[in-house]
Amino acid sequence: MGIANMTNKLDLLLQKPYVHHQLSVAELVEKVLQRNEGRLTHTGAVAVTTGKYTGRSPKDKYIVEEPSTKQTIDWGAVNQPMSPETFDKLYDKVLDYLMKKDELFVFKGFAGADPKYRLPIQVVNEFAWHNLFVHQLFIRPSAAELAAHEPQFTVICAPNFKADPKVDGTRSEAFIIISFERRTVLIGGTEYAGEMKKSIFSVMNYLLPEQGILPMHCSANVGQEGDVALFFGLSGTGKTTLSTDPNRRLIGDDEHGWSNRGIFNIEGGCYAKCINLSREKEPQIFDAIGFGAVLENVVLDDATRVPNYDDGTLTENTRAAYPLQAIKNIVDPSVAGHPSTIVFLTADAFGVLPPISKLTREQAMYHFLSGYTSKLAGTERGVTEPEATFSTCFGAPFLPRPAVEYAEMLGQKIAEHNVRVFLVNTGWTGGPYGVGSRMKLAYTRAMVQAAVEGELDNVETVQDPIFGLAIPSHVPGVPDDVLQPQNTWADKQAYEQKAKELAQKFRANFRKFAHIDPTIEKLGGPLV
């Protein structure tokens, strides 16, 4: 099936009388309830469940191997190739399936808040609640923008269409397939809404570097003087918590582009984790979950319809989707100048990385490529040994190009704009998990505040003997002895052993970057 035929078939589908275009939030909420797709919470949010897929399915994600992408994509476990023939057949089947539906829902909008670089997208949904989700998550067009809107990428999402691996060339019933030549994302077999969000992020991660823009998996905020800070970090390291600051306005919580004009949010909404959410801990997120927000896999009280955010029965990965405008303290539109500070967040359960350290450009590139954090492997089964995880550029699952391309762009931009970079450990202190304790949030906030406000620019530093990092000897609001990890351990020998163990894990992980400039590891990596 050629591209022209595909376009014709899609046009035919979208002209059907039962296809709803650009419904408002209120109309979509009505549809969700009429169609029995979800329930209304006491604040007017829509609560839905996603069946057996309560998170992304990275093993079911493919990119179509086409002449234009054959040489530019980093093929492998993250970016699995699929032939154009396999994709075309499956695309045809999904469209035939959607032709038979009673109702479909279409949203047109944008990815990218900077009008110069935004991507006009359209999303075709089988479910009304999915359409509500994309309405809240992507950038909503004005009436004038909608009239002139010509989609450059289409997401087709048919969760109840199940692939047959024997016939369809997939691994399972679920599939998330990106075709850059056909400018299409095809999703089926999974109801998890995050697939739509992250597939467009993957698309932007491929397209933006062609325009000299660095796409980033980070949160961003801006101070009263217009100073921009970026926060990189994997899940659970505190990106959302630390970038939500009453004294700074939020640009975005997850996906950004860095152009020669500055920073812009790729999205128009937030997709916040809400396990154990409380108004005391995260008032901005708690209060944003109002009318038209989407709650994914959150358990409700049957009578009062009040969400129980502490209930992880369905999944620990409970989520809330809401528009940025539901947060009071934001930059609107979500664009700002060049960053003056970058913070890499890691949750080190080995308890050996310093709570804050200043990075050189080479160290910044090294730690960006490493993308280190740790997770507590199987604590529920009594296994308490932490596991080191490395996710390149703090976003490996969403990077179609080789990691080095993103790291080199970051290195150039850090040098060009004289950006200060810090590594902040929000994990353990005084020993590894099980012995030490989690770093106090108040201390981490004080360190981040000092870093972002330039208070550490001229501070005296001590070099970490194992990781080579420059540790400030004093940070306002933080006891000095907390800053040096070895001082917090009772057993100094055990500290050294554990630190060397982690340093070796960094080295072993970095072997996969054998083809890059060796000075990055030489000047940026551990000393041992």
From Swiss-Prot:
Cite the binding residues for Mn(2+).
Answer: 198, 217, 254
Tell me the cofactor note. Answer: Binds 1 Mn(2+) ion per subunit.
Entry EC no(s): 4.1.1.49
Name the keywords, alphabetized.
ATP-binding, Cytoplasm, Decarboxylase, Gluconeogenesis, Lyase, Manganese, Metal-binding, Nucleotide-binding
Q: Report the record's Gene Ontology biological process terms.
A: gluconeogenesis
Which Pfam families does this entry report, sorted A to Z? Answer: PEPCK_ATP
EC top class named in words: lyase
Q: Which residues bind ATP?
A: 198, 217, 233-241, 282, 319, 444
Query: For this UniProt entry, what is the primary localization, expressed as one broad class?
Result: cytoplasm
Task: Name the positions where substrate binds.
Answer: 56, 192, 198, 319
| UniProt GO MF annotations | ATP binding; metal ion binding; phosphoenolpyruvate carboxykinase (ATP) activity
The listed locations are: Cytoplasm
Q: Which CDD domains match?
A: PEPCK_ATP
Catalysed reactions listed for this entry: oxaloacetate + ATP = phosphoenolpyruvate + ADP + CO2
Q: In which pathway does it act?
A: Carbohydrate biosynthesis; gluconeogenesis
| Gene Ontology cellular component terms for the protein in this record | cytosol
Q: Which cofactor does it need?
A: Mn(2+)
Which cysteines in this chain are paired by disulphide bridges?
none
Q: Which Gene3D superfamilies match?
A: 3.90.228.20, Phosphoenolpyruvate Carboxykinase, domain 1 (3.40.449.10), Phosphoenolpyruvate Carboxykinase, domain 2 (2.170.8.10)
Spell out the InterPro entries in the cross-references.
Answer: PEP_carboxykinase_ATP, PEP_carboxykinase_C, PEP_carboxykinase_N, PEPCK_ATP_CS
According to its UniProt entry, the function of this protein is described as: Involved in the gluconeogenesis. Catalyzes the conversion of oxaloacetate (OAA) to phosphoenolpyruvate (PEP) through direct phosphoryl transfer between the nucleoside triphosphate and OAA.
Q: Which NCBIfam families does the UniProt record give? A: pckA, PRK09344.1-2, PRK09344.1-3
Membership in a protein family: Belongs to the phosphoenolpyruvate carboxykinase (ATP) family.
Recorded protein name is Phosphoenolpyruvate carboxykinase (ATP)
Q: What is the lineage of its organism?
A: Bacteria, Bacillati, Bacillota, Bacilli, Bacillales
